[in-house]
Structure formats: C-alpha cells, structure tokens
Amino acid sequence: VLSASDKSNVKAAFGKIGGQAGDLGGQALERMFITYPQTKTYFPHFDLSHGSAQIKGHGKKVAEALVEAANHIDDIAGALSKLSDLHAQKLRVDPVNFKLLGHCFLVVVAAHFPSLLTPEVHASLDKFVLAVGTVLTAKYR
C-alpha cells in the first residue's frame, strides 16, 4: 500500500522524469531483454537489436502507462483497467515479468537521475512499480 509520503515521492519523481519517460521506458525494456533474455519470448516479431524502433516504441507505451498510473495514483486500477484487461485476456504475460521490467525501469532512472533516487524515493518508486504490476495481473485467472 502506498502511503501519502510514497504518493508524494512518486508524483515528484515523475514530475522530474516525465519528459524523458519514453526514452527511459525504451532503455528499461532493452535492459530487461539483455538481463533477462527469457522475456524476449513475448516479442518474437520485434527487432530486438540495440536502439530498435520497436523497442523504443513499446518502451514509450510502458512509460506512458507508468505516467498515467502516477497521474492517477489514488486509482491506479481504474487508470490501467483497459491495459490490465489486455494483459490478462490477450497477452497473458507471465506476472514475474512486470517485476523484472519495473526493476529495470528503476535502474535506468537511477542511471539518469542519481540524485533523485534517495533511499526514500527509491523505496516509494519500488512500491509504485510493484503496485502497477499487481494491477496489471489482477485480472489473471
């Protein structure tokens, strides 16, 4: 559960990274594919080479979903309801992959904004990406 302090930290962090979120999402996705190669199985039709337009494009979608969740932090489930349906009913992505991608996103944020990730903000962002992953897998059966 995100505390009031966590919510404030997440909103402030996304306020600082918001304009670069798309680039960060692409880098996080690429990092996930390199670090956890088993995650590539969900993207057999993608060009998975470094700097691929498909990775950047999907990474931007991931980042936009995170921004949307941050903008609606009091109702993440409502904000991501359609995306949750998509992942549960059509894509059927293994839930562990959301944790892996969330971790990679935090690593990329830390690399680009090292002073932003104080221990408190890091903990809040970690709880936030876990909350997003929980929402995205809530409709799995």
Curated annotation (Swiss-Prot):
GO CC terms in record: blood microparticle; haptoglobin-hemoglobin complex; hemoglobin complex
GO terms for biological process, alphabetical: hydrogen peroxide catabolic process
Positions annotated to bind O2: H58
Cell division in keyword set: no
InterPro entries linked: Globin, Globin-like_sf, Globin/Proto, Hemoglobin_a-typ, Hemoglobin_oxygen_transport, Hemoglobin_pi
Domain of life: Eukaryota
Keyword line: Heme, Iron, Metal-binding, Oxygen transport, Transport
Binding-site list for heme b: H87
Record-level Gene Ontology MF annotations: haptoglobin binding; heme binding; iron ion binding; organic acid binding; oxygen binding; oxygen carrier activity; peroxidase activity
Entry's transmembrane regions: none
Annotated Globin domain residues: 1-141
General function of this protein: Involved in oxygen transport from the lung to the various peripheral tissues.
Subunit structure: Heterotetramer of two alpha chains and two beta chains.
UniProt record similarity statement: Belongs to the globin family.
Protein name: Hemoglobin subunit alpha-A
Organism placement in taxonomy: Eukaryota, Metazoa, Chordata, Craniata, Vertebrata
